[in-house]
Amino acid sequence: MATEFTVPDSAARIATAQQAGGGTPVRSGPPDEGGEFSGDRMSLSMGPSHPSTHGVLRIQMELEGEILTKADPIIGYLHRGDEKIAENMTYNQFVPYTDRLDYLAPLANNMAYVIAVEKLAGLTVPPRCQAIRVITAELARISSHLMGLGAFGLDVGAWTVLVLSLNQREFLYNLFEDLTGARFTTSYTRIGGVTRDVPPGWLENVGTFCDKFLPALEEILSLLTRNKIFLDRTVGVGVISKEDAIAYGITGPNARGSGIATDLRKDRPYSGYEQYEFDVPVGTKGDCYDRYLVRGEEMRQSVRIIRQVIKNFPGGDWYATEAKKVFLPPKGKVLSSMEELIQQFMLVTEGPQMPAGEVYFEAENPKGILGFYIVSKGGGVPYRLKIRSPSFCNLSLVPKLCQGVLISDVVAILGSLDFVMGECDR
């Protein structure tokens, strides 16, 4: 739960700034007939190349002095047409494109997409595969929150937080590389399973990371949690009410920071999450500070989940053996069996054949709820694929959040929302 602190809130600072106004504006609207500027408003474009927009986002702002009267996010600079691309690719071929949605948590994106396809195909993966997916998803959550926390700290002037966060994330990338062969865009999850089983000693390395990470996390959080400057910049700033969070479709840590105790891993468990004990952190004020606290606690809970998975890690297969029509056969069998060779050829060229129908699945990703709606007319490619992006919903609230705040607070608000433009623009 969030802790209350008695510090000046944004409303008090705005009132002080307004009372101190009256000076000559830096720029004041369009020039009049005499060539002079008139009025008291200034137009300012923030981005699309700006360190505090966390990607290619542009905010078109209007200001009166240092107070924002308008802030319109302009998106689309990273639009690639992912949903249309999906209509011209087999279900397996689209997996790498999901890496590039929330590119800070590709393993979590993979899992959400393949579970949607498995739901369409009526497949159930074995417990070992589910356990692997849970571990990778929670490691991805920690990795994403570390980057969000570090960037947020940098935005408000805490450079050391970024350095320490990136240091811990490097250990995670080593684990990802050992498991998947890639550090960033992994493409590890497959329809009906995963690319390969966990290598020898990998689970022990994950456990060692968890043991070392928790003290490191406490050190990182101690730099911010009771830091007077950080409190001044975040407490009472960018408040999202419960009503606004629901109306705008805000999910994930941003919704939980506003007191909405919802988490799909608890409410609608998938991939075996119902087996694990963990808490859902919830804030009380809905401001930037509460969102920071929620993400910090979520990393602790992710470690708690990972330790339970390792302790009860199941044996058996890491892919659905009955899913021959969707899962590529092992390479050894392809080289020795004509039947397996033909199966691989058909899966690569035609794609896994799906029944006609439609399905929607959503997962609890680090940024919020990531959903995939798939319409199939049968065959190896989807007729329509729609992506429900949490970052898109989070950004839709920016005009309301930034109304009447100081321009310096915009940086804190954007950092606390922790969006990623690859997912928003897709």
From Swiss-Prot:
The keyword Membrane applies. It is a peripheral membrane protein. GO terms for cellular component: plasma membrane. Its EC number is 7.1.1.-. The keyword rRNA-binding does not apply. It comes from the Bacteria. It catalyses: a quinone + NADH + 5 H(+)(in) = a quinol + NAD(+) + 4 H(+)(out). Its main location: membrane. It is found in: Cell inner membrane. Residues 1-51 are annotated as: Disordered. Gene3D superfamilies: Cytochrome-c3 Hydrogenase, chain B. Keywords: Cell inner membrane, Cell membrane, Membrane, NAD, Quinone, Translocase, Transport, Ubiquinone. GO terms for molecular function: NAD binding; NADH:ubiquinone reductase (non-electrogenic) activity; quinone binding. NCBIfam families: NuoD, PRK06075.1. NDH-1 is composed of 14 different subunits. Subunits NuoB, C, D, E, F, and G constitute the peripheral sector of the complex. NDH-1 shuttles electrons from NADH, via FMN and iron-sulfur (Fe-S) centers, to quinones in the respiratory chain. The immediate electron acceptor for the enzyme in this species is believed to be ubiquinone. Couples the redox reaction to proton translocation (for every two electrons transferred, four hydrogen ions are translocated across the cytoplasmic membrane), and thus conserves the redox energy in a proton gradient. Belongs to the complex I 49 kDa subunit family. This is NADH-quinone oxidoreductase subunit D 1. It comes from Opitutus terrae (strain DSM 11246 / JCM 15787 / PB90-1). The lineage of its organism: Bacteria, Pseudomonadati, Verrucomicrobiota, Opitutia, Opitutales. The gene is nuoD1.
